[in-house]
């Protein structure tokens, strides 16, 4: 396991049962895990702190987004896939209890209309 993955897993274990979130940043040629505050009111979702994102961006090149699924499998949800597309970055997802990982890359994913939650004006 790479050092950044070990650091991300430690973060996820510390924040469980809330989702942890962070970034993978290349600083001076090395990948580093950048812890970010999860601003979501709901522990089953994550919202990266814009201040943490800006600090990471100043420190180096952001190459990926990380978050944990402490209550479910390390499998990308539709929301994860849409977020990955919007960010244009690889996403890593980890279940800290099981120690399992997955990653997804932007690939043109569009959420299906059937089964999508309806919201006025969206």
Residue spans of the language-model regions?
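Extracytoplasmic ligand/sensor domains, especially the bilobed periplasmic-binding protein
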Residues: 68
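Conserved beta-strand-loop surface patch within small alpha/beta domains used
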Residues: 1-62, 71-122
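Cys-dependent condensing catalytic cores that perform Claisen condensation/acyl-transfer
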Residues: 65
């Amino acid at each position: 396991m790479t050092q950044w993955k070990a650091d991300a897993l430690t973060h996820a274990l510390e924040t469980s049962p809330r989702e942890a979130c962070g970034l993978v940043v290349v600083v001076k040629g090395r990948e580093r895990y950048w812890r970010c505050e999860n601003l979501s009111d709901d522990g089953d979702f994550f919202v990266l702190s814009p201040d943490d994102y800006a600090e990471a961006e100043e420190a180096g090149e952001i190459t990926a987004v990380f978050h944990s699924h402490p209550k479910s499998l390390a499998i990308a949800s539709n929301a994860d896939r849409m977020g990955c597309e919007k960010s244009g970055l690889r996403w890593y997802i980890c279940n800290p209890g099981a120690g399992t990982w997955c990653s997804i890359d932007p690939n043109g994913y569009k959420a299906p209309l059937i089964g999508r939650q309806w919201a006025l004006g969206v």
